[in-house]
Swiss-Prot record:
It catalyses: L-methionyl-tRNA(fMet) + (6R)-10-formyltetrahydrofolate = N-formyl-L-methionyl-tRNA(fMet) + (6S)-5,6,7,8-tetrahydrofolate + H(+). One of its GO terms (cellular component) is cytosol. Belongs to the Fmt family. This is Methionyl-tRNA formyltransferase. GO terms for molecular function: methionyl-tRNA formyltransferase activity. (6S)-5,6,7,8-tetrahydrofolate binds at S107, D108, L109, P110. The keyword Transferase applies. Gene3D superfamilies: 3.40.50.12230. InterPro entries: Fmt, Formyl_trans_C, Formyl_transf_N, Formyl_transf_N_sf, Formyl_transferase-like_C_sf, Met-tRNA-FMT_C, Met-tRNA-FMT_N. It comes from Rickettsia massiliae (strain Mtu5). Disulfide bonds: none annotated. The gene is fmt. It comes from the Bacteria.
Length: 302
């Protein structure tokens, strides 16, 4: 099948690799190169790099206006696959090809529609999730489902683990669909259980020690690497990169450091910190961190 691919980050890479192997990718659309690092050198997106390596024509428009729509109409393709592209796709593009536009969404739709389904799945402590392949419409992740696979999450699944699982599973489902697309009956999404996975903000990363240790641990795993779950100490922002929660009763004020190994009393339970990063410094395990930053027992963190 002849395919136009629209995507940008690492999450979209497994699907493009599968499409290159099993189908004919006629064109790739991705975000423009962005300045990165201290030298602010322009860096191509992971999808741009992969397409370039396979000599596939790459386009990096700043908008999806008429000139881009006309270009897409001229590309000889049967279907468009859109994965974390970074632009809202207009109706003219959704309807440009015979089989429309397909999208991989890493959640149990209609739960976690929106920009940050992976992060919200972890933050909210979900123990089950899904990967859905849908035919896109003009709504926000409201399209009909062509294929879905459910799976269980381990209690302390990390964002990286969930990201990789969904990216690879989505790529496999996509190839199955394209092999049998004329025989698949789309299923409308339920109107029940709709939630929205809004984009994360830096402010959301601030830890509220009145919450349970379990909920804070979910936040730490769901917000690593960005924006990071953090607290302030001596006017410095400190991110917690890894921790574990203990279901232990205590009588301390929430936020109290109750041991010299940085165990912190929460609204319920205790958070045992394992890895941290102070702003503008490298990540350290707890032993290394405490050698340079002495957070005393009985300190109450804010």
């Amino acid at each position: 099948m002849k395919v136009i691919f629209m995507g940008t980050p690492e999450f979209a890479v497994p699907a493009l690799k599968k499409l290159i192997t099993h189908h004919e990718v006629k064109a790739v659309f991705t975000q423009q190169p962005k300045a990165k690092g201290r030298g602010l050198n322009l860096a191509k997106s992971p999808i741009h790099q992969l397409a370039f390596e396979h000599q596939i024509p790459v386009y990096t428009p700043s908008t999806l206006r008429n000139d881009v729509i006309n270009l897409i109409n001229k590309v000889n393709a049967d279907i468009i696959v859109v994965i974390a592209y970074g632009f809202i796709v207009p109706q003219a593009i959704l309807e440009a090809k015979k089989y429309g536009c397909l999208n991989i969404h890493p959640s149990d739709l209609p739960r976690h529609r929106g920009a940050a389904p992976l992060q919200r799945t972890i933050i909210e402590g979900d123990r089950k999730s899904s990967v859905c392949i849908m035919r896109m419409d003009t709504g926000l992740d409201t399209g009909d489902i062509l294929m879905k696979e459910d799976f269980d999450l381990e209690e302390r699944t990390t964002l990286e683990e969930l990201h990789n699982k969904c990216a690879n599973l989505g790529a496999e489902l996509l190839i199955k669909i394209l092999a049998n697309i004329d025989n698949i009956v789309p299923i409308k999404q339920s109107s029940d259980g709709v939630t929205y996975a809004h984009k994360l903000t830096k402010e959301e990363g601030k830890i509220n020690w009145h919450e349970s240790a379990y909920k804070i641990d979910c936040k730490i795993r769901g917000m690593n690497p960005w924006p990071g779950a953090y607290f302030s100490y001596n006017d410095k922002i400190i991110k917690i990169l890894e921790a574990e929660y203990l279901n232990a009763d205590h009588h301390f004020t929430s936020g109290t450091v109750i041991s010299d190994k940085l165990e912190i009393a929460c609204g319920s339970g205790i958070l045992r910190v394992k890895k941290l990063q102070q702003e503008s410094k490298k990540a350290l395990n707890i032993e290394e961190f405490l050698r340079g930053t002495n957070i005393l027992k009985d300190t109450v963190l804010k």
